């Protein structure tokens, strides 16, 4: 007889990040000493859905209607991803305890306006539960924000479990649409895990190459590598106050969006750098923001472990390595965890924590008043 969902240790994690290219999903078994990924899948966004979420990153007309329809569309993409996972693993829905669904971030303003601020991950978890027949856990970030935190990053606890070491400080870096780092002190030092968002990851790079070459991303960073970094433009980018702000801090596409880049390019008038050189400069910005934060906040680290789509960008990876002499730059794949699966694993784990009424945040990372149970449950 299959295990009931209440006793099962199988959870699904679904992540659609700020790159807005699609949904990454994993089916994870937490019954062993280490989580075991039973299946993984990527379901691309249809072009209209990607365009809808892109438009929702900035204020516009009839937002409530457009956001509601985009949420419905995302639920259907998520449901397709779940179906692929179950089919691949030959697992039936009634054996899965819950789905941890992140949603699509369209605004992230913690601590702003009224002292509390807000974060908005657009999705329709009730529809997802209806389509899959599985309990859904969603809205992970808002409780941390309500407790005075940034609501991000939420993955450092999982980074520590998967990649922490007894004998050395390590930094785990996720390069999605936005980049973030988790600083994992050597076990026994008594120092807490910390982490924060560094700045833009792939988002501006993907937007720029799509605008000029019609491709969704810069494969391997080849286009960036063929250009020349514009040092003046890079300096202007790095003058953004966010890079000087102290942790805890978090950011998103509502700051680092195409309009942010265009406002810098407008200062050049008709003497703007060539598009390929802007791509090289954007890639260098991603690498430099990460490298500077590693040097500033984890100078003792000798290992940087990278995950997310940016791990496939050879130009970014090489630039980071050049800026961090003495630091071994690796990927999570070197530790047996594919770079595309880490965040989805994290949201499967967060769903598990929620169903057990156990905290999911790390207050030293987010700045929240303390540990909190994250997420809201939508029964199947």
Curated annotation (Swiss-Prot):
One of its GO terms (biological process) is 1,6-anhydro-N-acetyl-beta-muramic acid catabolic process. It catalyses: 1,6-anhydro-N-acetyl-beta-muramate + ATP + H2O = N-acetyl-D-muramate 6-phosphate + ADP + H(+). The keyword Zinc does not apply. ATP binds at residues 17-24. One of its GO terms (molecular function) is ATP binding. It holds the Pfam family AnmK. Its EC number is 2.7.1.170. Keywords: ATP-binding, Carbohydrate metabolism, Kinase, Nucleotide-binding, Transferase. InterPro entries: Anhydro_N_Ac-Mur_kinase, ATPase_NBD. Belongs to the anhydro-N-acetylmuramic acid kinase family. Catalyzes the specific phosphorylation of 1,6-anhydro-N-acetylmuramic acid (anhMurNAc) with the simultaneous cleavage of the 1,6-anhydro ring, generating MurNAc-6-P. Is required for the utilization of anhMurNAc either imported from the medium or derived from its own cell wall murein, and thus plays a role in cell wall recycling. This is Anhydro-N-acetylmuramic acid kinase.
């Amino acid at each position: 007889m299959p295990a009931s969902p209440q006793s099962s240790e199988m959870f699904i994690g679904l992540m659609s990040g700020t790159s807005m290219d699609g949904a990454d999903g994993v089916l994870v078994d937490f019954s062993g000493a280490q989580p075991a990924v039973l299946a993984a899948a990527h379901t691309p966004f249809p072009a209209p859905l990607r365009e809808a979420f892109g438009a929702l990153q900035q204020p516009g007309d009839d937002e409530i209607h457009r956001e509601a329809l985009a949420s419905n569309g995302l639920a259907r993409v998520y449901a397709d991803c779940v179906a692929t996972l179950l089919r691949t693993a030959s697992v039936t829905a009634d054996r899965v305890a819950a789905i941890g669904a992140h949603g699509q971030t369209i605004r992230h303003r913690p601590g702003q306006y009224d002292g509390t601020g807000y974060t908005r991950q657009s999705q329709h978890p009730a529809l997802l539960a209806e389509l899959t027949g599985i309990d859904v856990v969603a809205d992970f970030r808002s409780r941390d924000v309500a407790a005075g935190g940034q609501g991000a990053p939420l993955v450092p606890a999982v980074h520590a479990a998967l990649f922490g070491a007894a004998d050395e400080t390590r930094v785990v870096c996720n390069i999605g649409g936005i980049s973030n780092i988790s600083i994992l002190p050597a076990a026994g030092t008594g120092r807490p895990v910390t982490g924060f968002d560094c700045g833009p990851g792939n988002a501006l790079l993907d937007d720029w190459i799509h605008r000029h070459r019609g491709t969704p991303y810069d494969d391997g960073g080849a286009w960036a590598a063929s250009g020349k970094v514009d040092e003046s433009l890079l300096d202007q980018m790095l003058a953004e106050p966010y890079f000087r702000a102290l942790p805890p801090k978090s950011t998103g596409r509502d700051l680092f969006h195409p309009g942010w880049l265009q406002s810098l390019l407008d200062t050049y008038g008709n003497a703007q750098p060539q598009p390929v050189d802007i791509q090289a400069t954007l890639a260098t910005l991603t690498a430099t923001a990460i490298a500077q934060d590693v040097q500033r906040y984890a100078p003792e680290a000798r290992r940087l472990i990278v995950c997310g789509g940016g791990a496939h960008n050879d130009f970014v990876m090489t630039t980071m390595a050049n800026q961090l002499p003495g630091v071994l730059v690796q990927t999570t794949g070197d530790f047996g965890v594919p770079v595309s699966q880490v965040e989805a694993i994290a949201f499967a784990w967060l769903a598990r924590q929620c169903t057990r009424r156990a905290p999911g945040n790390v207050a030293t990372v987010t700045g929240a008043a303390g540990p909190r149970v994250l997420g809201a449950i939508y029964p199947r």
